[in-house]
C-alpha cells in the first residue's frame, strides 16, 4: 500500500492519522482512525498497483475520527469495508465517479485495472454527504462479477444485525447480506429489487 500523495512510498504507522498494516492479497489490511474526540478526520488514502482481479481489487478508504474500517483482499479480488459500532462511514469511489456510501462488499472486475479514488469530504457528524440508492450502486458495479452489500440503516453493528435477521428470517449470517447486482436489477437473497423502485434500500 502506498501514499497517493507520495507514490511508491509506503505510509508509515500513524501516517495521516491512521495505523496501516500492509498485507499481500488474501490477508487483511486494517486502518485505525484517530482517537475519538480529537476533532480530526482520518483521511488516509490508500491505493495498490494495478493488478489482475485475482490479486486483489484496488481501493481507497476515508474514515472518520473514532472509527475504523477493515479492508481485505482475498484470492478472488474481494475488497471488504465494514464499519464497527462507531458511526464510521467508509466511502469508495469508482472510476465512473459515483460514491458508494455505507457498508460495502464488492468484487469489482471493472476496478481491478486502476486505482479507486475517494474524496476527503465527510461532514462533521460522519454521515455520508452523498447517499446512494441500490440502483446507483448496482449500476456502478460490474454486472458480471459485481457483488455489493448495502444497509438502509445507519452503519452500526446493531443496524447490520437487524437487517441480516430481517432478511434471512433467523440468525444473522457470518458475512453481510449479499446483494447480487446486474444490469437489470438487484437480487437480495432470493428477492428481486427493480432498479426503478428501490427507495427502501437507500444507503445513509
Swiss-Prot record:
Its EC number is 4.2.2.25. Cleaves the glycosidic bonds of gellan backbone and releases tetrasaccharide units of glucuronyl-glucosyl-rhamnosyl-glucose with unsaturated glucuronic acid at the non-reducing terminal. The enzyme is highly specific to the heteropolysaccharide gellan. This is Gellan lyase. GO terms for cellular component: extracellular region. Optimum temperature is 70 degrees Celsius. Active from 50 to 80 degrees Celsius, at 55 degrees Celsius it has 50% of its full activity. Thermostable, retains full activity after heating at 60 degrees Celsius for 24 hours. In the absence of substrate, its half life at 70 degrees Celsius is 50 minutes. In the presence of substrate full activity is retained after incubation at 70 degrees Celsius for 2.5 hours. Activity is stimulated by zinc, potassium, lithium, cobalt, sodium, calcium, iron, manganase, magnesium and mercury ions at a concentration of 1 mM, but inhibited by copper ions at a concentration of 1 mM. Activity is inhibited by potassium, sodium and magnesium ions at a concentration of 1 M. Activity is inhibited by urea, EDTA, dithiothreitol, p-CMB, PSF, natrium lauryl sulfate and N-bromosuccinimide. GO terms for molecular function: gellan lyase activity. Induction: By gellan. The lineage of its organism: Bacteria, Bacillati, Bacillota, Bacilli, Bacillales. Most active from pH 5.0 to 8.0. Keywords: Lyase, Secreted. Multimer. It catalyses: Eliminative cleavage of beta-D-glucopyranosyl-(1->4)-beta-D-glucopyranosyluronate bonds of gellan backbone releasing tetrasaccharides containing a 4-deoxy-4,5-unsaturated D-glucopyranosyluronic acid at the non-reducing end. The tetrasaccharide produced from deacetylated gellan is beta-D-4-deoxy-Delta(4)-GlcAp-(1->4)-beta-D-Glcp-(1->4)-alpha-L-Rhap-(1->3)-beta-D-Glcp. It is found in: Secreted. Transmembrane segments: none annotated. The keyword Lyase applies.
Amino acid at each position: 500500500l502506498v501514499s497517493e500523495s507520495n507514490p511508491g512510498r509506503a505510509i508509515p504507522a500513524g501516517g495521516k492519522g491512521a495505523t496501516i498494516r500492509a498485507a499481500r492479497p488474501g490477508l487483511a489490511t486494517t486502518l485505525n482512525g484517530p482517537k475519538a474526540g480529537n476533532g480530526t478526520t482520518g483521511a488516509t488514502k490508500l491505493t495498490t498497483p494495478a493488478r489482475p482481479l485475482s490479486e486483489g481489487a484496488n481501493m481507497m478508504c476515508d474514515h472518520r475520527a473514532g472509527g475504523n474500517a477493515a479492508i481485505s483482499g482475498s484470492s478472488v479480488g474481494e475488497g471488504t469495508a465494514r464499519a464497527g459500532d462507531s458511526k464510521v462511514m467508509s466511502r469508495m469511489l469508482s472510476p465512473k465517479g459515483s460514491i458508494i456510501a455505507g457498508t460495502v462488499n464488492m468484487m469489482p472486475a471493472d476496478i481491478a485495472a486502476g486505482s479507486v479514488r475517494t474524496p476527503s469530504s465527510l461532514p462533521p457528524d460522519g454521515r455520508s454527504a452523498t447517499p446512494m440508492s441500490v440502483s446507483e450502486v448496482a449500476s456502478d458495479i460490474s454486472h458480471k462479477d459485481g457483488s455489493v452489500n448495502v444497509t438502509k440503516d445507519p452503519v452500526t453493528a446493531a443496524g447490520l444485525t437487524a437487517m441480516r435477521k430481517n432478511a434471512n428470517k433467523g440468525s444473522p449470517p457470518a458475512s453481510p447480506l449479499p446483494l447480487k447486482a446486474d444490469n437489470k436489477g438487484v437480487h437480495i437473497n432470493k428477492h428481486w429489487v427493480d432498479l426503478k423502485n428501490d427507495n427502501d434500500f437507500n444507503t445513509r
